[in-house]
């Protein structure tokens, strides 16, 4: 293990959310890191600031590429790169072993008590919450998270303790080779239709992941979720609970249901401070009050997963509850962008806006369930304001497979804008368009297609017109998607005359 950690690893796609934290962890552990990427980014800048040589752009000639890889022991390639990518082919021609991220993770996490946090939704927030709790408890964990977390200084944390928190993705079988001491499954739904042909194949993948838990380990699951229940059934367990082990692994469930081992009741959002509050029960006994700055019932479920997991790692529930109160969220998870207080205002007012104002929130939601939960969280704190949603669909395959589910996801919105599909790794060979979604949405009636180039100008015009009405109680505007939609909020505020978040 020590030899592996001092290796020289060259990362292809080093600036991506999947590989950049692995590079940081390897570097912090005493290893040597180099890499390449197709484009510059803040993640690349962070690694360069730590002395990592990174080439940006097209693959160089054979001699230059060989010099670039001089001294490397292994090449780790992003899952986004095909096997015939020139740099993968060239690395193999040089005799270097090439590993995919999923193949490298078991080596990186060897020797740790691995906590693998999986699920179709909620992985990043749950991983971030758990890492913050374990750090506050003195366990000094190592962590790899799929989102930037300001309280942790980024998307990776290199600790000196024996616990490794890993956000574990099902895409491309990324979690298939892990051997966790604790596996967390937040929920299971059909996602990534480009690799999973149906919901059954997703459940099978999660069941295989659950079987990887080490003997004597723990499987922490949301017992309320039908997809999780189906996975447990596939594992041979007839229902969620805490009385039977699966393959010598204790199953610990959480949720809102009366039978859950960890349960939240009396969930409310208080109007005065927008805090989410609940009472937490363990085995039917009240253990304390949960207070979160992050909104929504789904955030309460994430917190329950953290409570269950941290307790198994020796952290007192009371201490976990105290730390969770301080959690401020992960990037692009109901993230505040800024306020604009109407046509007469060009300065903004910082952390709070009154009637007639615009508040912009950005969220990574790109699946119908995520859209629905984010809108429900927004409704809980809207206080009479209109909720406007701006969706950039992400990938043609997801859009096609889940089109009807998307159409039913907007009932908590007052107005919906759908812009052009973000292709990501795909090409448009399905003949679908964002207009196909607009035609299917029946609620709300105010649903529009706006092309990407025209989006910010159209939003700015509509916001000005709406907020010019003295009767307007204001707008809570959500930008949703996993692509470039995150740029829309700042650009909209700039177009309105204010660009600084409070």
Curated annotation (Swiss-Prot):
Signal peptide: none annotated. Its EC number is 6.3.2.8. Transmembrane segments: none annotated. Coiled coil: none annotated. GO terms for biological process: cell division; cell wall organization; peptidoglycan biosynthetic process; regulation of cell shape. Keywords: ATP-binding, Cell cycle, Cell division, Cell shape, Cell wall biogenesis/degradation, Cytoplasm, Ligase, Nucleotide-binding, Peptidoglycan synthesis. Belongs to the MurCDEF family. This is UDP-N-acetylmuramate--L-alanine ligase. It comes from Frankia casuarinae (strain DSM 45818 / CECT 9043 / HFP020203 / CcI3).
């Amino acid at each position: 293990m020590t030899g592996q950690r001092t290796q020289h690893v060259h990362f292809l796609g080093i600036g991506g959310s999947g590989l950049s934290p692995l590079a940081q962890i390897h570097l912090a552990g005493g290893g040597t890191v180099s890499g390449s990427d197709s484009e510059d980014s803040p993640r690349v800048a962070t690694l360069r600031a730590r002395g990592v040589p990174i080439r940006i752009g097209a693959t160089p000639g054979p001699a230059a590429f060989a010099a670039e890889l001089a001294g490397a022991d292994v090449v780790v390639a992003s899952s986004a790169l095909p096997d015939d990518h020139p740099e993968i082919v060239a690395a193999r021609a040089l005799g270097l072993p090439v590993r995919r991220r999923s193949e490298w993770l078991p080596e990186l996490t060897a020797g740790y008590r691995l906590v693998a946090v999986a699920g179709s939704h909620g992985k990043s927030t749950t991983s971030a919450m758990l890492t913050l709790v374990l750090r506050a408890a003195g366990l000094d964990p190592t962590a790899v998270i799929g989102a930037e977390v300001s309280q942790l200084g980024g998307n990776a944390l290199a600790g000196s303790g024996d616990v490794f928190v890993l956000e574990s993705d099902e895409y491309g079988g990324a979690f298939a080779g892990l051997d966790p001491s604790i596996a967390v499954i937040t929920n299971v739904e059909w996602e990534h239709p480009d690799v999973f042909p149906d919901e059954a194949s997703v459940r099978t993948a999660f069941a295989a992941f659950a079987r990887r838990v080490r003997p004597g380990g723990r499987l922490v699951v949301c017992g309320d979720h039908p997809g999780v229940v189906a996975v447990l059934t596939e594992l041979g367990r007839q229902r969620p609970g805490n009385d039977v082990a699966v393959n010598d692994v204790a199953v610990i469930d959480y949720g809102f249901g009366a039978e859950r081992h960890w349960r939240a009741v009396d969930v409310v959002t208080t109007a005065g401070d927008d805090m989410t509050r609940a009472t937490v029960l363990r085995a039917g006994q009240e253990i304390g009050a949960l207070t979160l700055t992050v909104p929504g019932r789904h955030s309460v479920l994430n917190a329950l997963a953290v409570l269950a997991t941290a307790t198994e790692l020796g952290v007192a529930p009371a201490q976990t509850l105290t730390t969770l109160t301080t959690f401020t969220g992960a990037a692009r998870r109901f993230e505040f962008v800024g306020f604009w207080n109407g046509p007469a205002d060009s300065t903004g007012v910082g952390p709070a806006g009154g009637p007639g104002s615009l508040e912009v929130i950005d969220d990574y939601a790109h699946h119908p369930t995520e859209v629905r939960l984010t809108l429900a969280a927004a409704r809980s704190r809207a206080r009479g304001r209109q909720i406007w949603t701006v969706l950039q669909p992400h990938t043609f395959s997801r859009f096609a497979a889940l089109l009807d589910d998307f159409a039913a996801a907007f009932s908590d919105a007052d107005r919906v804008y759908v812009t052009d599909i973000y292709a990501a790794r795909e090409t448009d060979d399905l003949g679908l368009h964002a207009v196909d979604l607009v035609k299917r949405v029946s609620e709300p009636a105010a649903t529009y297609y706006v092309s990407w180039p025209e989006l910010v100008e159209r939003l700015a015009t509509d916001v000005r017109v709406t907020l010019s009405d003295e009767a307007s109680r204001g707008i809570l505007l959500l930008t949703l998607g996993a692509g470039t939609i995150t740029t829309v909020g700042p650009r909209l505020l700039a177009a309105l005359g204010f660009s600084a978040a409070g």
